[in-house]
């Protein structure tokens, strides 16, 4: 299960970020401005954000097996269609539809994790799966540059799209929505997953709770604080996923090949950061038995550190030193990812797909805005201006985690 979810994470990030490596070539071929490129990057994010709540509902209603099979097939085909864009409007439309397809991926994966892993392992499981996604962004510059050198930028989308189609077919035949539906899972394993002793009856959710309580979810201050804090991660990460290759090539005047060698380093650091954050939040939880500080402490430290390092990254004139600062910054940003998703699962009760979809919707909307703002600031102010904004957003995230978020308070709790 963890292997398949990790591969899914890898595919989602490969397909959403491959355009960042192709962007300089696409921009030159079609004559796109920086603001137009930012809009193309953001088209995916806005669609991805809009599709989160429907994706969460589909996941909680129909299960991860069916939902992931359908959506991975769909977005993989849309990845291939990207190669047939003929201009700005068609590229925006294709990326928007592609984003709708990917929107159900993480709500469905989160639903699957909730059924298949105990509470004490949720941080690490989130860390492993999300680190696979981050590791994918490390591979993209290397593989995409090699493909582009041989066959051009359009071939990138054909190759990566085919990978997702293969995964969807395998997932449908090997996955089950719940561990009790899998004959390979014995009673002891099932009891461990459900945090109970062998022979103890499984606690069923009351009938009234089986209907998704959207009013309670959407009026939970705690849920909205988590969602807003998650914006610190997405706002910063969109720079690394979409703008960093162009920034290195145009601001530091390096070649496509050198960019392909340097860009993976901050992205690999991000993958390590996700794993570290997942391990750290579970380590603190197992020692303290408190969700409150196991989630908050990691996020506060990571966001404060990343905010402080973002500006030195911008002011370094040496591309290698810049990449080192960016690697440290992305490591810290990414440490907040696993505890953020674990917190969404913690407060969700039995509705993790729906709650996580709201959090991801808000976060991806913020990331989409950042892609446009970054391009506009570069075009009309300077390459340095957007780094101040990113640093400020991450500082705000740290303050939310420090003073307003309580991972132990359920969204349905109004006491």
Residue map of PLM features:
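Cytoplasmic helix-loop-helix junction between adjacent transmembrane helices
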Residues: 94-134
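A membrane-interface helix-boundary motif in multi-pass transporters
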Residues: 149-162, 255, 294-297, 376-393
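Helix-loop-helix hairpin linking two adjacent transmembrane segments in secondary transporters
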Residues: 133-182
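A late C-terminal transmembrane helix in Major Facilitator Superfamily
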Residues: 345-380
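Helix-breaking motifs and short loop linkers at transmembrane-helix boundaries and internal kinks
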Residues: 31, 63, 84-90, 101, ...
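Structural signature of the two symmetry-related core transmembrane helices
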Residues: 66-80, 292-311
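Extracytoplasmic gate region of multi-pass secondary transporters
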Residues: 19-20, 218-277, 334-341, 345
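Conserved MFS/SLC helix-loop-helix module at the cytosolic interface between two early adjacent transmembrane helices
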Residues: 50-89
């Amino acid at each position: 299960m963890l292997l398949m979810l990790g591969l899914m994470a890898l595919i989602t990030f490969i397909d959403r970020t491959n355009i960042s490596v192709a962007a300089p070539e696409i921009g030159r071929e079609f004559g796109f401005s920086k603001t137009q490129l930012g809009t193309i990057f953001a088209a995916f994010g806005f669609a991805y954000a809009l599709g989160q709540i429907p994706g969460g509902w589909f996941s909680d209603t129909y299960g991860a097996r069916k939902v992931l099979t359908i959506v991975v097939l769909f977005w993989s085909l849309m990845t291939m269609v990207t190669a047939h864009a003929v201009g700005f409007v068609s590229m925006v439309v294709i990326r928007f539809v592609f984003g709708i397809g990917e929107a159900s991926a993480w709500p469905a994966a989160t639903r699957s994790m909730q059924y298949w892993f105990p509470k004490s392992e949720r941080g690490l499981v989130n860390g492993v799966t999300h680190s696979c996604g981050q590791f994918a962004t490390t591979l993209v510059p290397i593989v995409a540059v090699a493909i582009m050198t041989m066959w051009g930028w359009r071939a990138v989308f054909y190759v990566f799209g085919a990978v997702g189609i293969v995964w969807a077919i395998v997932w449908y035949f090997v996955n089950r929505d719940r561990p009790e539906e899998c004959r390979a899972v014995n009673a002891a394993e099932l009891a461990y997953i459900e945090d109970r002793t062998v022979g103890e009856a499984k606690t069923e959710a009351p009938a009234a709770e089986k209907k998704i309580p959207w009013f309670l979810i959407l009026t939970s201050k705690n849920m909205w604080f988590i969602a807003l804090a998650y914006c610190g991660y997405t706002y910063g990460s969109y720079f690394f996923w979409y703008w960093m290759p162009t920034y290195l090539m145009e601001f530091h005047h390096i070649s496509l090949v050198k960019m392909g060698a340097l860009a993976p380093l901050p992205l690999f650091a991000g993958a390590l950061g996700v794993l570290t954050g997942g391990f750290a939040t579970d380590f603190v939880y197992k020692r303290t038995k408190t969700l409150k500080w196991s989630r908050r402490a990691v996020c506060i430290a990571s966001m404060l550190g990343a905010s402080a390092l973002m500006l030195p990254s911008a002011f370094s004139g040496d591309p290698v030193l810049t990449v080192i600062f960016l690697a440290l910054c992305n490591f810290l940003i990414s440490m907040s990812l696993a505890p953020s998703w674990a917190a969404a699962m913690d407060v969700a009760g039995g509705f993790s797909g729906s709650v996580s979809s709201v959090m991801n919707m808000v976060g991806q909307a913020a990331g989409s805005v950042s892609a446009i703002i970054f391009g506009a600031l570069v075009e009309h102010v300077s390459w340095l201006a957007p780094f101040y904004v990113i640093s400020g957003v991450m500082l705000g995230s740290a303050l939310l985690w420090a003073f307003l978020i309580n991972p132990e308070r359920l969204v349905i709790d109004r006491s």
